Amino acid sequence: MRFIVSLLAFTAAATATALPASAAKNAKLATSAAFAKQAEGTTCNVGSIACCNSPAETNNDSLLSGLLGAGLLNGLSGNTGSACAKASLIDQLGLLALVDHTEEGPVCKNIVACCPEGTTNCVAVDNAGAGTKAE
């Protein structure tokens, strides 16, 4: 009986200490403090901040390549074949190929961009690619 109680107490303690890490892992990009810090200082008054991958990375990822080919993702201006998605779309579709998970929460994996409403091209903004990346 003591063994079972000890085992349950250990399991509860291990689960409680693991919760903060898993909570950060399950955080949404659109509400991530780490993403807000990554995009800090950028202005995008004409649309939404988005995460983009380079054409080389997009071509290596069959899911992103398929979404880009179907016109579901915007492209980065000047980089035909790149994939960009708004934070809300990344959260809705679970496009994890565009996101790195850090201890503070999710951030854009490669390029932070501004995607004007009503266009298919996004423009890289200040701090593009300079955000915190998980090693």
From Swiss-Prot:
A GO term for molecular function: structural constituent of cell wall
Function as written in the Swiss-Prot or TrEMBL entry: Aerial growth, conidiation, and dispersal of filamentous fungi in the environment rely upon a capability of their secreting small amphipathic proteins called hydrophobins (HPBs) with low sequence identity. Class I can self-assemble into an outermost layer of rodlet bundles on aerial cell surfaces, conferring cellular hydrophobicity that supports fungal growth, development and dispersal; whereas Class II form highly ordered films at water-air interfaces through intermolecular interactions but contribute nothing to the rodlet structure.
Disulfides per UniProt: C44-C114, C51-C108, C52-C84, C115-C122
GO cellular component: extracellular region; fungal-type cell wall; spore wall
Keywords: Cell wall biogenesis/degradation, Conidiation, Disulfide bond, Glycoprotein, Secreted, Signal, Sporulation
Biological process according to GO: asexual spore wall assembly
Origin species: Emericella nidulans (strain FGSC A4 / ATCC 38163 / CBS 112.46 / NRRL 194 / M139)
Name of the protein in question: Class I hydrophobin dewA
Glycosylation sites: N60
Consequence of gene disruption: Lowers the spore wall hydrophobicity.
Primary residence: secreted
Reported induction: Expressed after 12 to 24 hours post induction of asexual development, which correlates with the development of metulae and phialides. Not expressed in hyphae and strongly induced during development.
Applications: Hydrophobins such as dewA can be functionalized for use on orthopaedic implant surfaces by producing surfaces enhancing the adhesion of human cells such as mesenchymal stem cells (MSCs), osteoblasts, fibroblasts and chondrocytes. Improved cell adhesion potential of human cells on these surfaces is not coupled with enhanced bacterial adhesion and therefore does not introduce increased risk of bacterial infection.
Assembly behavior: Forms homodimers at high concentrations, and these dimers are off-pathway to rodlet formation. Dissociation of the dimers into monomers, with resultant exposure of the hydrophobic face, is necessary for self-assembly to form functional amyloid fibrils called rodlets. Self-assembly into fibrillar rodlets occurs spontaneously at hydrophobic:hydrophilic interfaces and the rodlets further associate laterally to form amphipathic monolayers.
Signal sequence region: 1-18
Organism domain of life: Eukaryota
Localization per Swiss-Prot or TrEMBL: Secreted; Spore wall
Family: Belongs to the fungal hydrophobin family.
Gene: dewA
Record flagged with keyword Coiled coil: no
